[in-house]
C-alpha cells in the first residue's frame, strides 16, 4: 500500500465533522501521514479507482453529483470535473473492466447510472439507466450498491423498500458496448429486512448479502452462465441476546476467501463467519467490538489488515485479522479523521 483515500461526510444535516476527501501516504512503519484534504462538493462519501490506477471517482452523498480526479505521482488528487446525474443521493460507484464506463447507484433516485469516461479520465455523459420501480407510479425502491461479480460481467444491486418500494437484490447482466443493464434474476426480501450490501467470493459462485434492518447475512449460490441466484442460508449479524436493531452496514469476504465479515452500526460490532470450503455455507465464529462508534464501512488492505471506518467517533481502526482463526485483534494504529465513511487503497 502506498496511499489511502478516505471519503468523509461534511454536512450539518449528517452531523458531520469531515472536511472532504482526504489523501494519506502510508509510511514504511504502517502509520498514515495526511498529504491532502480536498473539498470539491459536500459529502464525498464513496469512491473507486479506475483499472489503470490513474483516476479516482467519487460520489457526493445526499446530492446528485459525481466527481472525477487525476491521481498525481505523489498520490494527491487533481480535480477534473463534476457532473450532475440527476439521481439523488449517489451511494456507490465502480468502473467496468474495460475502463470505458462508470456505474453509479443512487439511493433516493432508485436508479443505476452508466456514465461514459472521457479520454482524459473525466466523466462524460450518462449513456444508460436502470430504475428499480416502487409500489406506485413515480415511486422507487432505493438502490444501495453496484457490486461486480469477479469477472465484471454482472452487477449485483441491493435495494431497500423504505415504505414506497421493495427490499430486494437483483442480478443484472452488463453490456459493455451500450452500458445497459438487463435483469437476469432477483431476490425479494422480507418486508422491512432491507438488503444493503453484498460481497462476492473469489470463486465467483458464492455471494453473501447483509440486510440493514433484518440484521442478517444471507448466502446465495450464483450461476454465471444463467445469471441466476439461489438463496440457501441466513444467519444473524448479532448475538441472540441482542434484541434491538443493529443496522448491519458493510459485508466483505476476507482476502483468503475463508471468512465473511459484517459490521453493525448500532451495536458498534463486527460479526465474523467461517466459510465451508466445500459448500459455501457460513458458521458464526464470533462478534468483536469495533472500538469506535458507527462502523459504516470497513475493508481489507493488501497487507491483510482490516480497516474499520467509525463514522461517529471520527476514527479508522486498524485490526490484524488471523485467516486461520478468524480473530480480529486491534493494533496500535488509529487514524483520526472527521466522519470517515469509505476507504480506498492504492498500492
Where are each of the predicted segments found?
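Short loop/turn segments immediately following beta-strands, especially the blade-tip
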Residues: 24-30, 69-75, 114-124, 171-180, ...
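Beta-rich catalytic cores
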Residues: 17, 43-45, 89, 142, ...
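Conserved beta-strand positions in repeat-built beta-propeller and related beta-rich domains
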Residues: 6-9, 14-15, 58-62, 104-108, ...
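Short coil/turn segments that connect the beta-strands within blades of beta-propeller domains
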Residues: 1-2, 52-54, 98-100, 151-153, ...
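Loop/turn-rich, solvent-exposed surfaces of beta-rich toroidal or solenoidal domains
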Residues: 246-311
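Asp-box/WD-like beta-propeller blade repeats and closely related beta-sheet repeat scaffolds
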Residues: 77-149
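A short beta-strand motif characteristic of beta-propeller blades
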Residues: 33-39, 78-84, 127-136, 182-189, ...
Amino acid at each position: 500500500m502506498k496511499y489511502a483515500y478516505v471519503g468523509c461526510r461534511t454536512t450539518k444535516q449528517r452531523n458531520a465533522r469531515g472536511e472532504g476527501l482526504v489523501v494519506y501516504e502510508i509510511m514504511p512503519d504502517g502509520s498514515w501521514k495526511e498529504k491532502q484534504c480536498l473539498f470539491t462538493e459536500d459529502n464525498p462519501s464513496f469512491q473507486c479507482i479506475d483499472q489503470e490506477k490513474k483516476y479516482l471517482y467519487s460520489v457526493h452523498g445526499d446530492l446528485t453529483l459525481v466527481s472525477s480526479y487525476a491521481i498525481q505521482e505523489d498520490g494527491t488528487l487533481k480535480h477534473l470535473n463534476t457532473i450532475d446525474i440527476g439521481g439523488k443521493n449517489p451511494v456507490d460507484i465502480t468502473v467496468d473492466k474495460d475502463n470505458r464506463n462508470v456505474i453509479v447507484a443512487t439511493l433516493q433516485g432508485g436508479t443505476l447510472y452508466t456514465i461514459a469516461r472521457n479520454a482524459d479520465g473525466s466523466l462524460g455523459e450518462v449513456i444508460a439507466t436502470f430504475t428499480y420501480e416502487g409500489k406506485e407510479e413515480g415511486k422507487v425502491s432505493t438502490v444501495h450498491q453496484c457490486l461486480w461479480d469477479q469477472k465484471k460481467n454482472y452487477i449485483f444491486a441491493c435495494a431497500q423498500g423504505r415504505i414506497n418500494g421493495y427490499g430486494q437484490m437483483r442480478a443484472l447482466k452488463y453490456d459493455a458496448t451500450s452500458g445497459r443493464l438487463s435483469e437476469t434474476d432477483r431476490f425479494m426480501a422480507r418486508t422491512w429486512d432491507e438488503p444493503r450490501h453484498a460481497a462476492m467470493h473469489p470463486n465467483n459462485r458464492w455471494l453473501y448479502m447483509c440486510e440493514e434492518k433484518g440484521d442478517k447475512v444471507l448466502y446465495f449460490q450464483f450461476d454465471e452462465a444463467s445469471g441466476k441466484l439461489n438463496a440457501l442460508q441466513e444467519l444473524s449479524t448479532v448475538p441472540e441476546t441482542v434484541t434491538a436493531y443493529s443496522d448491519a452496514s458493510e459485508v466483505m469476504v476476507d482476502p483468503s476467501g475463508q471468512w465473511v465479515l459484517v459490521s453493525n452500526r448500532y451495536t458498534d460490532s463486527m460479526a465474523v463467519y467461517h466459510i465451508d470450503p466445500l459448500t459455501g455455507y457460513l458458521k458464526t465464529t464470533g462478534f468483536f467490538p469495533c472500538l469506535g462508534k458507527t462502523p459504516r464501512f470497513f475493508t481489507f488492505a493488501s497487507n491483510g489488515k482490516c480497516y474499520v471506518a467509525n463514522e461517529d467517533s471520527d476514527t479508522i481502526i486498524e485490526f490484524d485479522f488471523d485467516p486461520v482463526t478468524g480473530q480480529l485483534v486491534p493494533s496500535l494504529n488509529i487514524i483520526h479523521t472527521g466522519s470517515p465513511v469509505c476507504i480506498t487503497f492504492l498500492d
